[in-house]
Amino acid sequence: MTTDSVTQGVAHSVNGRLPELDFENRPSGAKLGIFDLPKLEVSVAPFTLAHIRVPGGVTTAEDHHEVREIWLVQSGSGILTLDGVRSRVRAGDTLYYESYRRHQLHNDGDSPVEIVSIWWRP
């Protein structure tokens, strides 16, 4: 972790870098790491920032929620199903989901799909 101190579980950034994530294993096999910005000594952000890692051959659980969401696909490619419509997504793509849109990603390759996800309440 790139920090100068950790006090009561709060990381203090030395050089603007956030602490390394602890990824949570999801039932689908995908991994989710959430940057908990409000717990850091930085301005409280009006959004949540996360890193999603989908290993090869894994399909995420279908998701839909009140929050709006943007995905920035960093690496890999796969098949996105958005409200029942399938399309290929790949590194460099930016995706936006309005509230309650059903979305699911299948990694049909061998390399992980890495996604930066940002979500916020409407």
UniProtKB/Swiss-Prot annotation:
Regulation: Inhibited by 1,10-phenanthroline (OP).
Effect of residue 26 to A: No impact on hydrazine bond formation
Cofactors that this protein relies on: Zn(2+)
Biotechnology: applications noted: May facilitate future development of novel N-N forming biocatalysts.
Entry keyword Metal-binding: yes
Swiss-Prot/TrEMBL catalytic activity: N(6)-hydroxy-L-lysine + L-glutamate + ATP = 1-L-glutamo-2-N(6-)L-lysinohydrazine + AMP + diphosphate + 2 H(+)
Phenotype for residue 28 to A: No impact on hydrazine bond formation
InterPro entries in alphabetical order: Cupin_2, GPI/OXD, RmlC-like_jellyroll, RmlC_Cupin_sf
Location of region: Cupin 2 conserved barrel: 55-119
Example of a GO MF term: metal ion binding
Protein task: Catalyzes hydrazine (N-N) bond formation from an unstable ester intermediate, the product of the ATP-dependent condensation of L-N(6)-OH-lysine and L-glutamine substrates by a methionyl-tRNA synthase-like protein.
UniProt name for this protein: Cupin 2 conserved barrel domain-containing protein
Biological source species: Rhodococcus jostii (strain RHA1)
